[in-house]
Amino acid sequence: MKLSPATKSFIGKTVDISTFAIQWGFVPFVVYLGFKKGAEPMPNGQILPLSAMSLLWG
């Protein structure tokens, strides 16, 4: 299938713009999702007693 030069140029520009948007938009998007969801609840600080029996049989 032959593509005209205008179509090739359009596809090239589209790929360039998409690459730019993905490269520069990924980190801000992840930060946005982190702020939107919020932090996980903090642990209550309770110290669990560990022994060989609790490690083996829960």
From Swiss-Prot:
It is a single-pass membrane protein. Keywords: Membrane, Mitochondrion, Mitochondrion outer membrane, Protein transport, Transmembrane, Transmembrane helix, Transport. InterPro entries: Tom7 (IPR012621). It comes from the Eukaryota. Residues 1-16 are cytoplasmic. GO terms for cellular component: mitochondrial outer membrane translocase complex. GO terms for biological process: mitochondrion organization; positive regulation of protein targeting to mitochondrion; protein import into mitochondrial matrix. Disulfide bonds: none annotated. It is found in: Mitochondrion outer membrane. Residues 36-58 are mitochondrial intermembrane. Forms part of the preprotein translocase complex of the outer mitochondrial membrane (TOM complex). This is Mitochondrial import receptor subunit TOM7 homolog. It comes from Caenorhabditis elegans.
